[in-house]
Amino acid sequence: MELPLSQATLRHTLLLLPALLSSGQGELAPQIDGQTWAERALRENEHHAFTCRVAGGSATPRLAWYLDGQLQEATTSRLLSVGGDAFSGGTSTFTVTAQRSQHELNCSLQDPGSGRPANASVILNVQFKPEIAQVGAKYQEAQGPGLLVVLFALVRANPPANVTWIDQDGPVTVNASDFLVLDAQNYPWLTNHTVQLQLRSLAHNLSVVATNDVGVTSASLPAPGLLATRIEVPLLGIVVAGGLALGTLVGFSTLVACLVCRKEKKTKGPSRRPSLISSDSNNLKLNNVRLPRENMSLPSNLQLNDLTPDLRGKATERPMAQHSSRPELLEAEPGGLLTSRGFIRLPMLGYIYRVSSVSSDEIWL
């Protein structure tokens, strides 16, 4: 007498029955949530548990999970058997935390009897709110009043976002824009939204709003200035030009300073102050320097009376003593201190000339 099946065993048997009927006699076919191939939309960071079931065969099946080709550890796994070895099956559960980098989940089965593999796949469609990667504007002078503005925004979103351009006063300027899907392999979910419009005022602050089923994101553009529309000078060019101007100014200032210093040196000239070397307390000797007339002078202890010609013999009446404070004169030619040429000799000083003058009796040179 056979024992009645329990309710739990009956329920699992009914779940495995569609897989057993679809797989055919002697073939094992895993299914994920009742389907061999499916696509599942998940929001980013959402947790979802997938269940892989297999039915049929005479041996115990082996199930394994692969996420983007990487082997994963199952959350739970359970084997079923009904009526001994005549009917067997199993289930395995794996929980996924959705990330935008995830693409495909596979449940792989290795049939112990035939050795042939079988797979069930789920394509993961991870959705997230829009992200504005870059926003900008290009301004051009329009034929009419105002500015011709080309607005562009790089938006990354899944599903694709609807982009709206709004001005500072609130009303919608443009509610639709042309968009271009970029390289989907290198830049997934990235689109370029571009719109062209004409502004009548320069004081506009524009903003872009991107929306999809997951969320809303906005970004603002600076007000287009008049200088930005007419002058576009790279920052590097400004820095280089400033450096060149500063270097030129410093070089010119240095050149002017050098010229001024040279001119002052030429104006002053070399020092002409003579250096006197005292060889004796009564005798003075000039260095080999030619003195200008205004700097030449007689010895400090020389008096003009000593050089006055006295043909009547006054010079002989005033003998010169060795202890006198005045310097001794060289012996004059016969006839007095003056020579026949009109000058006298002083020790080691050369000649002193006497010439006639209009303003005075005589001038000593």
UniProtKB/Swiss-Prot annotation:
Signal peptide span: 1-26
Keywords: Cell membrane, Disulfide bond, Endosome, Glycoprotein, Immunoglobulin domain, Lysosome, Membrane, Secreted, Signal, Transmembrane, Transmembrane helix
Residues in the Cytoplasmic compartment per record: 254-365
Designated gene of the protein: Tmem25
Glycosylation-annotated residues: N106, N162, N192, N205
Protein name: Transmembrane protein 25
Subcellular location: Late endosome; Lysosome
Extracellular side: 27-232
